[in-house]
Amino acid sequence: MARYLGPKCKLSRREGCDLLLKSGVRDHKSKCKSEKLPGQHGDKKPRLNSYGIQLREKQKIRRLYGILEKQFRNYYKKAARQKGSTGENLMALLERRLDNVVYRMGFASTRAEARQLVAHKAILVNDKVVNVPSFLVNPGDTISVRQKAKNQGRIQAALALSEQRAPCDWITVDTGSFKGTFSTAPTLMDLSSDYNVNLVVELYSK
């Protein structure tokens, strides 16, 4: 299961925004103090051409969801084959990933932690164990925490932290029973305005 293991603050600094790669126990600015780009010449921000802007936007979204390049490109190809807007299809696929849904429901403080919970068989989909983080959840699917994992301190802490985040309209969660339902795939209007997925479509369609 390939994944990035380097410093997380470095990625957020490179993209110039909080990629939510670390838990919300401390404020992002106190964890990633430097506003400069990483590296020896980080205080010199380069001028980006159109390709550079598209590339940075792709890297931002890819890193936000914790996906490596090959898998991200495969998601784009799948989205392009589907009917409708390629950008909207791409974001819907990313949001349907099981590790992302577990994070959105508040059972993990980061997507990386959610990926670990899934891989360690702590998560059920429709009452069946699924240990594949990239598993695509369908509308109406029920996601829950296994009984023996409910007392894990990190899950309890994540649920407390999730109360600070804005609720997702496409997900319903019963924190008391450690269970939630994925109602529908979100639209671009539902998601953050901090990124522009259309730039990714322009980049890959060249």
Curated annotation (Swiss-Prot):
GO terms for biological process: ribosomal small subunit biogenesis; translation. One of its GO terms (cellular component) is small ribosomal subunit. CDD domains: S4. Keywords: Ribonucleoprotein, Ribosomal protein, RNA-binding, rRNA-binding. GO terms for molecular function: rRNA binding; structural constituent of ribosome. It comes from the Bacteria. Pfam families: Ribosomal_S4, S4. PROSITE patterns: RIBOSOMAL_S4, S4. Residues 96-161 form the S4 RNA-binding domain. One of the primary rRNA binding proteins, it binds directly to 16S rRNA where it nucleates assembly of the body of the 30S subunit. Belongs to the universal ribosomal protein uS4 family. Part of the 30S ribosomal subunit. Contacts protein S5. The interaction surface between S4 and S5 is involved in control of translational fidelity. This is Small ribosomal subunit protein uS4. It comes from Legionella pneumophila (strain Paris).
